Amino acid sequence: MSGPLRKHHPLLKVVNHSVIDLPVPSNISVMWNFGSLLGLCLVSQILTGLFLAMHYTADVNLAFSSVAHICRDVNYGWLLRNLHANGASFMFICLYMHIGRGLYYGSYFYRETWNIGVMLLVLTMATAFLGYVLPWGQMSFWGATVITNLFSAIPYLGPDLVQWLWGGFSVDNATLTRFFAFHFFLPFMIAGLSVVHLLFLHQTGANNPTGLAGDVDKVPFHAYFSYKDVVGFVVLLAGLVFIALFSPNLLTDPENYIPANPLVTPVHIQPEWYFLFAYAILRSIPNKLGGVVALAMSIVVLFFMPFVHSSRQTSHNFRPLAQVLFWLMVVNVLLLTWLGGQPVEYPYIFLGQAASVIYFVNILLLIPIVGYVENKLLFS
């Protein structure tokens, strides 16, 4: 058979159509780089996590010591641990940028791709939460206790569900063991779902900044965009290595360097920085069940994006009013992130409630209204 092997070999053909001869709109910007960066982060996390798991002990009496042993006694264990812990932060930065790009340029109209992407977000958040528990420091223990306790707000099933999650009547050895098992398994599930995400994306083709059909002007992914992605890889890895070597504790909580003690509650229980926006929404509602529903809705609301979009234009590029709402949402999420790290007292309680209301009103009410107004101004 004539032609390159990659074009007719059963396995190489799949790779060829996915990353080499893939037709891509010629006008996509650097904002389309974050998907490949997330793939790099996932590979990095799986590899560093695999080597850490070889030395970690999932036992409440030994977990904290085993992490200290990895950092002190294992060759380059400190580097593996720093890369893994900070790699999670970099992965969430890329993830939020990827979602932001999708919201700005209307990628949610590719519904299967978008819905699987939101599922990937939920799985990644679950994996990160489980990983935060494993070092068995103070914030690990109390974070696990507080977050798993939220399931008790579910009517009728709640208390039994919490005991089933714990494997007993409190967060203990059974909890840590199953959290480690799921933390090890979920990244492979994320990798599999990412392949499905790409499969659906390549069925429709990539979006582009204009929001218009890009079929008239497409170029092969390699070499036009593969080299562009490599630049992103270099920048991301340089940033990750810099943080891991020079300031590895910049994004971590000092409270987690104290071994878990069920008898001493930390002054301020909080998750890692990338969950603080959702945590602020949870805390803003005084009712437990209401807070859990609001927490879930802060992520689930992304599923509604194709339905609340009422404008005839896909992208925000040519929609000044919609751009104002988008940047209001960005600033609001940053404000919620800051508020999630503040103590539960005035004025942070009121500010958190106001920011939470703005978050949902913006997405569920203002976006459809502005789309309708723009249609009237432009097309009537």
From Swiss-Prot:
It is found in: Mitochondrion inner membrane. One of its GO terms (biological process) is mitochondrial electron transport, ubiquinol to cytochrome c. A ubiquinone binds at residue 202. Heme b b566 binds at residues 98, 197. SUPFAM superfamilies: a domain/subunit of cytochrome bc1 complex (Ubiquinol-cytochrome c reductase), Transmembrane di-heme cytochromes. GO terms for cellular component: membrane; mitochondrial inner membrane; respiratory chain complex III. One of its GO terms (molecular function) is ubiquinol-cytochrome-c reductase activity. The cytochrome bc1 complex contains 3 respiratory subunits (MT-CYB, CYC1 and UQCRFS1), 2 core proteins (UQCRC1 and UQCRC2) and probably 6 low-molecular weight proteins. Belongs to the cytochrome b family. Component of the ubiquinol-cytochrome c reductase complex (complex III or cytochrome b-c1 complex) that is part of the mitochondrial respiratory chain. The b-c1 complex mediates electron transfer from ubiquinol to cytochrome c. Contributes to the generation of a proton gradient across the mitochondrial membrane that is then used for ATP synthesis. This is Cytochrome b. It comes from Branchiostoma floridae.
